[in-house]
Every structure is written in C-alpha cells, then in structure tokens.
C-alpha cells in the first residue's frame, strides 16, 4: 500500500519536478480533469516506494534495466491511497553471465475505487543462487 498524497504534496512536487498547471493550479486542473492531479512521475514514485522498501532488499538486485512498458491509465488524485500489486512475469537466466538473470514483473497501482492509475513492466538484473555441483 502507498499512502495518499495531500494537495500540498502534489503541488510542491510538481513545482520542483513537473511544473505543469494541471499539477500546480487547482482551478485550471478542475476545468480539464475535474480537480488537481498528481504528476505521473510522482504517481510512479508512490507506486515504487513499497517495492523498493519491502521487496528489493529481499532479492539480490543488481540494478534496473529500464521499462518494457509504462502507463498512467488514470490520474492519481489528492487523498487517494494506492493499492499496490506486483506479479513476477518471467525469470530468465543470463546466457553470458551464469551468476545472474533477468526478472520481469508487472507493478500495478490502483486507487480506492480499484481503478488502475499506474502500471509498469520493469526488468531487473538479479544475482542467481550458486548451483550445487555433484
């Protein structure tokens, strides 16, 4: 679960990182989106925070490899906590480096109405367990 963001947090983040009026000017955002919305980048960070704090320390993460896909189907709004779902979709051993592999997972974040506001498929390089020789 990712905590809700306040209007002030959304505006503060947007002023520094994504200063579009739809994230900083509530009156303007209301005309277009029915109210203030969070930057997609802030939504992504909210979705990834539990993953980085809870999952990544438990796996032998070497580093991220980018995103196979990244979407914001709906905006995140002030006061909406996000439900986070993670599904591992593939694990592939490296052909050139036997001590590592690539794990791909789908990360979904949904608002309280269970509508998806963020979905991504990031591949991650991970260490493999040593195989036992017989």
Residue ranges of predicted features:
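Hot-dog-fold acyl-thioester-processing enzymes
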Residues: 1-66, 129-134
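HotDog/MaoC-like acyl-thioester-processing domains
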Residues: 72, 76-81, 85-134
């Amino acid at each position: 679960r990712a905590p809700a963001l306040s209007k002030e947090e959304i505006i503060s983040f947007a002023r520094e990182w994504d200063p579009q009026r739809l994230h900083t000017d509530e009156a303007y955002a209301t005309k277009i989106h029915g109210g203030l919305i969070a930057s997609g980048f802030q939504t992504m960070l909210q979705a990834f925070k539990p993953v980085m704090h809870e999952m990544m320390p438990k796996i032998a993460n070497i580093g991220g490899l980018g995103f196979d896909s990244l979407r914001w189907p709906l905006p995140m709004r002030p006061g909406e906590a996000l439900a986070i779902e993670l599904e591992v979709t593939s694990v592939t051993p490296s052909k050139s480096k036997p001590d590592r592999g690539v794990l791909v997972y789908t990360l979904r974040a949904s608002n309280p109405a269970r509508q998806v506001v963020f979905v991504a498929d990031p591949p991650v390089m991970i260490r493999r367990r040593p195989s036992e020789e017989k």
